[in-house]
Amino acid sequence: MIAVLFSFVIAGCIYYIVSRRVRRSRLPPGPPGIPIPFIGNMFDMPEESPWLTFLQWGRDYNTDILYVDAGGTEMVILNTLETITDLLEKRGSIYSGRLESTMVNELMGWEFDLGFITYGDRWREERRMFAKEFSEKGIKQFRHAQVKAAHQLVQQLTKTPDRWAQHIRHQIAAMSLDIGYGIDLAEDDPWLEATHLANEGLAIASVPGKFWVDSFPSLKYLPAWFPGAVFKRKAKVWREAADHMVDMPYETMRKLAPQGLTRPSYASARLQAMDLNGDLEHQEHVIKNTAAEVNVGGGDTTVSAMSAFILAMVKYPEVQRKVQAELDALTNNGQIPDYDEEDDSLPYLTACIKELFRWNQIAPLAIPHKLMKDDVYRGYLIPKNTLVFANTWAVLNDPEVYPDPSVFRPERYLGPDGKPDNTVRDPRKAAFGYGRRNCPGIHLAQSTVWIAGATLLSAFNIERPVDQNGKPIDIPADFTTGFFRHPVPFQCRFVPRTEQVSQSVSGP
């Protein structure tokens, strides 16, 4: 009996290995991995800067489309804009799904977020509502909030410049609440910490294969006290933070609005536009979810972009001086104007913002798309439910398109006459995702950074820190290596350019 059972086991293993080899021959190239179920390339997967490893694998296997089996999760990595465009954009109807993460969606409560909603009717409804208000033209209605936040940031920096990172996070969050709900954000509001914690948890849990519960969903039923169920305890903390992040501002707005204590906002406008003959509960649920999108985008990605902008200005003072020369030509008697990114008289600043989103890839691998049915590309089989990663870092660091890609160089987008050179690929499109799942807040994020950057450089010289002898200290241009990328914390100095700075910024 034992011999028979042993024979069946051996036969099963042989069948698995042979069938795997046959199937593997039809898949895109990639590292071979270990031919054991739920193992595959698990031990090949990098913990830090995976975009660099994926690019190197592409070179090793002479391909721009890679296949890996990460512990049972099939993944395809696209290392060039050509493959990304062919699949995620031209075949967007089948490449627009999302990983239905048990950890992120169910346990951590991120099922409200457009970025993680399954492609379908609900996604279309919420995306349509959000995109209408935050289109390139639509964001103009929120310009006052962007300018106000930029001016208040200058005021804070004149008082406590050493807390610049906290001030940026606070003002971006305050702007998000103003735009989304028409309410204010108090100093040291616990909501801000909850938002930071929720986004921090998301960055950790978004890494495919990080938690076993995504491969084995039944693990979600384990009690939190069970040995090895640390993920349940983490999820509980992160979910409470996410719930507070979504619920608090909406409930505050609903409470204050009847008293006339809120300003016009995205949520208030959508509530007023509700179909009174329709399903009011459903409509309000959609409004609440999409209003939270304003903060989700600003709470992490825009903060990262602003921090990277400051880092670039410190590392490249010659760039800073050129931007300031443009700005000074528009400054009237030391007063800081309310800048508008549509101003054609500031081409160098606009080029600087383009370069910023290329130089600091906030999501180097973007959020993975999920293939909704089997597909064939270049003769390769890409199986249904494969997670498809766009290696944005590789696209934006392609030396054939952007020579010396590690260097922050706005001039690459300008012609000899100093005017925009439209023959150079605009990196901002790649920086905000691809196809039908690109970031719907792209226009708000770009204009926010543009306005804040212009305002800061009008008010301050951003300089390197100095040592005890007054000698400038060099700081490295280092970034974190997780799923979402941020500059590693650094010090700098904000030196007012005139004595009028604090008096000239009173806000609109």
Swiss-Prot record:
Keywords: Heme, Iron, Metal-binding, Monooxygenase, Oxidoreductase, Signal. One of its GO terms (biological process) is psilocybin biosynthetic process. Transmembrane segments: none annotated. The keyword Iron applies. Disulfide bonds: none annotated. Its EC number is 1.14.99.59. GO terms for molecular function: heme binding; iron ion binding; oxidoreductase activity, acting on paired donors, with incorporation or reduction of molecular oxygen; tryptamine 4-monooxygenase activity. Residues 1-19 form the signal peptide. It catalyses: tryptamine + AH2 + O2 = 4-hydroxytryptamine + A + H2O. InterPro entries: Cyt_P450, Cyt_P450_CS, Cyt_P450_E_grp-I, Cyt_P450_sf, Cytochrome_P450_fung. Pathway: Secondary metabolite biosynthesis. It is an enzyme of class 1 (oxidoreductase). Its cofactor is heme. The pharmaceutical interesting psilocybin as a treatment option against depression and anxiety is being investigated in advanced clinical trials. Coiled coil: none annotated. Heme binds at residue 439. Cytochrome P450 monooxygenase; part of the gene cluster that mediates the biosynthesis of psilocybin, a psychotropic tryptamine-derived natural product. The first step in the pathway is the decarboxylation of L-tryptophan to tryptamine by the decarboxylase psiD. 4-hydroxy-L-tryptophan is accepted as substrate by psiD as well. The cytochrome P450 monooxygenase psiH then converts tryptamine to 4-hydroxytryptamine. The kinase psiK catalyzes the 4-O-phosphorylation step by converting 4-hydroxytryptamine into norbaeocystin. Belongs to the cytochrome P450 family. This is Tryptamine 4-monooxygenase. The gene is psiH.
